[in-house]
Structures are given as C-alpha cells and as structure tokens.
C-alpha cells in the first residue's frame, strides 16, 4: 500500500489483472490504505511477508509476484542495523522459500535499489558497476538480490531484479522521515520553506 506498490497495483487492476496486495501496513514504511481507494477490486491482505498462513494462501495460483516488501530508509538502517537486516534480508529468505514451495517457478520481480552500488564510480551506473554499499540498507538489499538470484538459478522461482533509484510520482509519501530526499524537498517546497543543499547539489 506504499508508493511504488500502490501505483503498480492500481495500474495492473485497471488493465484487468487480478491483484492481491500483501502489506504489513507499517505507516513508517509509507503504507497508506487510501493509495488503493480507486481500485476497490484489489484484494488486500494485511500481513507480514513472513506470515506463512497469510502469504501461502496469497501465492496459490499467481502468475507473477512483485516483491516490494522491505524498509527503504538508509538512515534507519544505520540507527538499527539488526532491524534492517530482519526486514530486508531475513524476511526475504522466508518469503522466497514460501514462493518456491507454494508456487514453484513463479516469476518474482524484486524491487531492489541502486544503493547497492554505493558512490558511483561512473555514470550511468550499470550492472557491471562494482557493488560497494555505503550503509546497512544497501548491504541487506544486496543480500536480498543474491537470494533472488540463487533461488532463480536453482529453478525454484524465476526471478528478475530491478535496481531503482530516486523514484517519484503520484502517491509518494511526503511526510515520512527517512523516505528519501525527493519527498522531503517536495514537502519543503510546498510549505514554502528553505531547502538545504550540501556541496554543489550534483
């Protein structure tokens, strides 16, 4: 029910897909039930992706899983690395094991982050760029990418990984701390407040 997931879910439902959303509804991660209000046909299951009883039922009969579960805050990961590891790495292990067992061979599209590459050594950053995360969020997200690749290589699932960066658009949370600088900048601009830019802004 967060920013990216809700946009994809609403578009898929409008295209005629049968959509089920599994979300723990953590407001600190951007969850907002109103994001899905325009698509009442979407089935919503409020559960953590580690909740086998909820997730296994949701996985039965699906063609594609869009896996956007996790914590995206880099600052939160540095304050509480164990929590970030639990949400972004350990939870993915549980979830992928369920996918392989309940829906063998299912296509899983994982929304990773460009943050796994760290400070760019060249632009544009591509898949050949060295992996050098600069925070725990990047480390744990990289572990999740490796889990998806391993499960896919073993034939249990058919995984695809996207490395997203600075995504913005409709339904973006502007008032959730730690959700990226774009939302913060937009909120400050709307409030007519000063936006502080460090360095030359590049």
What are these regions (language model features)?
Residues 1-167:
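N-terminal Rossmann-like NAD(P)+-binding domain of SDR-like oxidoreductases, especially those catalyzing
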């Amino acid at each position: 029910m967060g920013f990216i997931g809700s946009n994809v879910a609403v578009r898929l439902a409008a295209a005629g897909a049968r959509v089920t959303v599994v979300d723990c509804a953590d407001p600190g991660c951007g969850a907002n039930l109103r994001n899905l209000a325009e698509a009442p046909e979407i089935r919503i299951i409020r559960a953590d992706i580690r909740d086998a009883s909820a997730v296994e039922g949701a996985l039965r009969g699906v063609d594609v899983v869009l896996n956007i579960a996790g914590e995206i805050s880099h600052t939160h990961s540095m304050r509480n690395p164990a929590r970030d590891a639990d949400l972004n790495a350990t939870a993915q292990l549980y979830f992928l094991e369920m996918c392989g067992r309940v829906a063998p061979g299912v296509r899983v599209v994982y929304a990773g982050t460009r943050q796994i590459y760290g400070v760019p050594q060249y632009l544009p950053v591509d898949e050949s760029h060295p992996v050098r995360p600069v925070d725990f969020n990047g480390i744990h997200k990289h572990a999740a990418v490796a889990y998806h690749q391993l499960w896919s290589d073993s034939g249990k699932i058919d995984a695809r990984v996207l490395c997203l960066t600075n995504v913005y658009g409709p339904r973006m949370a502007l008032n959730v701390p730690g959700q990226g600088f774009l939302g913060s900048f937009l909120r400050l601009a709307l409030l007519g407040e000063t936006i502080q830019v460090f360095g030359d802004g590049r």
